[in-house]
């Protein structure tokens, strides 16, 4: 408010900026997946890849605290985008996470307020849902099977838990290295996939979205076992 001639007058509303697409990247433990996820040529629609820092080095062994720190840092990045940089709420935002980073990204995709133009992509989410899947009898992710809450929460993610369209990708039993037991735990043998399958995604976000489509999706979820 300001005054003119003794009369209070409302200040004109600040016009939001039209900002280009951005891709917030949360890599896995010891930066797994970060190299390709941060390549601009693999980002969708010319989005600018921005790494969200969080504790994920070898010495960072408190996974619960690590995920919480990542969630806080990602929310800060979103605040800076919409408030500090005054970007329009229609600015295209991709939130992409792999493994430990998928737990971070998925938590924010479940809780971020509505009304924004966000697309999620999760590689090897340990809480991956078993429903809405292209794989009959899909068992879902490892952390969803733990008897106590794991980092990122307890149980498999709710079928309709995401607030924004989210593509979740997991290497299944027919992939070259077998099932990735982090996101597809059908048996104890699938745990071997942490070494033979888990590190070997393309991390080509643009190609994955071209292959499987961007949202909207039913229940904001497109759940894909590869191949």
What are these language model-derived features?
Residues 1-11:
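Secretory targeting and sorting signals
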Residues 8-10, 70, 102-105, 124-126:
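Small-side-chain structural scaffolding
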Residues 14-61, 65-88, 111-227:
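Surface cap/lid and interfacial helix-loop subdomains adjacent to catalytic sites
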Residues 93-109:
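Gly/Ala-rich beta-loop-alpha elbow adjacent to hydrolase catalytic centers
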């Amino acid at each position: 408010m300001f005054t003119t001639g003794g009369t209070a007058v409302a200040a004109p509303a600040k016009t939001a900026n039209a900002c280009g697409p951005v891709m917030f990247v949360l890599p896995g433990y010891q930066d797994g997946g970060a190299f390709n996820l941060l390549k601009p040529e693999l980002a969708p629609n010319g989005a600018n890849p921005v790494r969200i820092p969080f504790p994920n080095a070898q010495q960072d062994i408190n996974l619960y605290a690590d995920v919480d720190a990542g969630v806080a840092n990602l929310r800060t990045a979103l605040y800076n985008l919409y408030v500090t940089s005054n970007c329009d709420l229609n600015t295209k935002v991709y939130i992409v996470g792999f493994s430990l980073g998928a737990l971070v990204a998925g938590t924010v995709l479940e809780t971020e307020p509505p009304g924004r133009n966000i697309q999620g992509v999760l590689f090897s989410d340990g809480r991956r849902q078993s429903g809405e899947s292209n794989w009959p009898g899909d068992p879902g992710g490892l952390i969803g099977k733990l008897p106590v809450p794991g980092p990122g929460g307890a149980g498999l993610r709710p079928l309709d838990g995401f607030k924004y369209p989210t593509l979740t990708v997991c290497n299944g039993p027919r992939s070259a290295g077998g099932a990735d037991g982090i996101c597809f735990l059908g048996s104890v043998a699938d745990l071997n996939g942490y070494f033979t399958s888990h590190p070997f995604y393309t991390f080509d976000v643009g190609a994955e979205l071209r292959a499987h489509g961007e949202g909207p999706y039913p229940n904001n979820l497109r759940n894909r076992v590869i191949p």
